[in-house]
Amino acid sequence: GEECDCGSPANPCCDAATCKLRPGAQCADGLCCDQCRFIKKGTVCRPARGDWNDDTCTGQSADCPRNGLYG
């Protein structure tokens, strides 16, 4: 299966020919991915909204999980 979106050859993290991450890359895109690496745990990826707390990166994924916590 695909590890990354190979539709854009400009993505430096993804090999457009194989749709696989390039050697050394942890991720190719996502709110918690920066320069092919997972953003460190606790970094705000989605600011608080209303009564909801900030959503933060896990350090293990490129996705920004919804923490579901009220402030």
UniProtKB/Swiss-Prot annotation:
The keyword Secreted is assigned to this record: yes
Transmembrane segments: none
Compartments it resides in: Secreted
Chief location bin: secreted
SMART domains tied to this protein: DISIN
Chain span(s) of sequence motif Cell attachment site: 49-51
Source taxon at top rank: Eukaryota
Keyword check for Secreted: yes
PROSITE patterns on file: DISINTEGRIN_1 (PS00427), DISINTEGRIN_2 (PS50214)
Keywords associated with the record: Cell adhesion impairing toxin, Disulfide bond, Hemostasis impairing toxin, Platelet aggregation inhibiting toxin, Secreted, Toxin
Expression by tissue: Expressed by the venom gland.
InterPro entries: Disintegrin_CS, Disintegrin_dom, Disintegrin_dom_sf
Other comment: The disintegrin belongs to the medium disintegrin subfamily.
The protein's name: Disintegrin horridistatin-2
